[in-house]
Each structure stands twice: as C-alpha cells, then as structure tokens.
Design a protein with these regions (language model features):
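DNA/chromatin major-groove-contacting recognition/catalytic segments
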Residues: 226-258
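N-terminal core-binding DNA-recognition domain of tyrosine recombinases/integrases
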Residues: 1-58
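A short, basic/aromatic helix-end/turn motif that makes direct DNA contacts
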Residues: 103-109, 214-221, 229-236
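Short, basic (Lys/Arg/His-rich) helix/loop patches that form interaction surfaces
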Residues: 174-215, 219-220
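DNA breakage-rejoining catalytic core of tyrosine-based enzymes
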Residues: 53-70, 125-135, 150-152
Length: 258
C-alpha cells in the first residue's frame, strides 16, 4: 500500500507510518461501530492491516540482554502491575507482536490434550497458529483472567474497559523504561518491537531454525536474516528455550491477593 511505498522510498519514517496506520484503524473502527449501530453494513479494510517489520540487519546492541529483561519484569512485579508483567512476558517468552497482544481474546485461550494452556491464534494470510504457553506464564495468565473476572472478549483493556491499543502498550512500556534507564538498569529505551526482536533472537540462539521460528512467530523466512548479526555476536549467552527466563507465579499470586 501507499504507506509501505513511502517508507521504502524514504519519504516517510517507519514510526510515522505505524502511527498513521493506528489512527486510520481507530477512525475506521469508530465508523464501523456507528454504521452498524444504525443498521447498515460497513467493511473495515484496516482491521487486519499491519506494516511489515523493517527489513534491515539488527546491530548486536539492538536488543536487551538477559539482565535487562529481568530488570524490566522485576520492575513490573515490584509495582504490582500484573497486566504490564503479563504483556511484557507474552512478548519476551512467546514473541507475540504488539498487535497480536492487543487483539487477544479470552476465547483464544484453550487447553491441549496434555492439559497445557495454548493460544489458538486466528488465521492471518490464511495461516493459523496454535501456540503452547510455557507453564509458568500459563499459571500467571490463568490467575490474571480469574482475578480480572474476564468472561469473554479482550484480555487487556484500558481504564475505560475498552480494548487496549498498540499505543497504550507502548506508553505502558515507556513508563517503565524511562525509570529503568535513569536508574541505569537499562542501557536504552526499548519498544514492544524491540522486546519481540529479543524473543526471536533467543529462539534462534537456542537452536531453532529460521523456518521454525518464522512459522512460530507468523512471519516469512526472509525476515530472519535481520538477526544474523545478533546471533553471530551471541550477546545473549544463554539458551533460548524460554524456560531460561523463569517467572515466579507465587509472587504474582501474592500481588493479586493484595
């Protein structure tokens, strides 16, 4: 579309394109709601539209290391902010995109035959994904759903109980990175996209093939080349099986009860 063409030609920055698309989605969602409420049909063509991630090789210092990830998650825990902790963890441990997190519904959460919680992602480009949630994260998610009394619909909402938007999650993350950078617990400010880059890098360094990671995260294989520099430098010197980033469910339980 025209946004991608402008980004590729250098006439528009990637971040500006993302913001413009977000605005268009919000406007069309309003029009759709208004039109349907007045008994007419409206096709929201922007509902499933998204911009591809920037196609470039990431430098070795582009992503947070294991200590920085721990500092971020610990800050959310210390603030008793279970929603922030869960949102950050879904990116870091499962590589979900910002948009996917905002679009999560309770109906997508299910159990497989072995009793593990899973996310049945809706089809995108005619491709479905069935993602097993790590046990520690599954415990936290289950606790969160019960504590928030979520019966159906959006898993994450704003203070007005409307579905959270991508700019809301970015602001939420920024509220933590601002403090952590000042406290020298982060090297720089990170975005939701940066956290996803870290998640994918962990998967690749843990031995998963580019095709396997691409399939799991819902992107095309060509995007995997952007992580070559990070993998070669091996700045995150741990296995990328996400069990290496352990989460303590007992502390979450304590926070919810408080």
């Amino acid at each position: 579309n025209s946004l991608i063409e402008k980004v590729n030609s250098g006439r528009l920055s990637y971040n500006t394109a993302v913001m413009r698309l977000s605005v268009m989605k919000s406007v069309c969602t309003f029009i759709e709601t208004y039109t349907v409420n007045h008994g007419r049909k409206y096709v929201n063509h922007f509902e499933s539209m998204s911009l591809p991630e920037q196609d470039k090789i990431l430098p070795k210092d582009a992503i947070p290391d294991a200590k920085e990830i721990d500092n971020l998650l610990s800050a959310a825990l210390d603030a008793n902010d279970n929603k922030a902790f869960l949102i950050f963890s879904l990116v870091i441990k499962m590589g979900l995109t910002n948009q996917e997190i905002c679009n999560l519904n309770k109906e997508y959460i299910c159990q497989n035959q072995t009793g593990h919680l899973c996310i049945n992602m809706p089809p995108k480009n005619h491709i479905s994904r069935f993602l097993i949630i790590p046990d520690d994260l599954g415990t936290i998610l289950d606790t969160y759903i019960v504590a928030e009394n979520i019966q159906s619909g959006a898993l994450f909402t704003n203070i007005r109980k409307n579905r959270i938007k991508m700019r809301d999650t970015e602001r939420l993350l920024a509220s933590y990175t601002d403090k952590l950078v000042k406290a020298k617990k982060l090297r720089k400010h990170y975005t939701m996209q940066t956290l996803r880059h870290a998640a994918i890098s962990y998967m690749l360094m843990g031995g998963a093939s580019k095709d396997e990671v691409a399939s799991f995260t819902g992107v095309t294989g060509k995007w995997m080349n952007r992580y070559d520099k990070i993998i070669a430098d091996n700045i995150i010197n741990v296995a990328a099986n996400y069990n290496v980033i352990n989460i303590n469910p007992s502390k979450i339980d304590k926070n919810v009860s408080e």
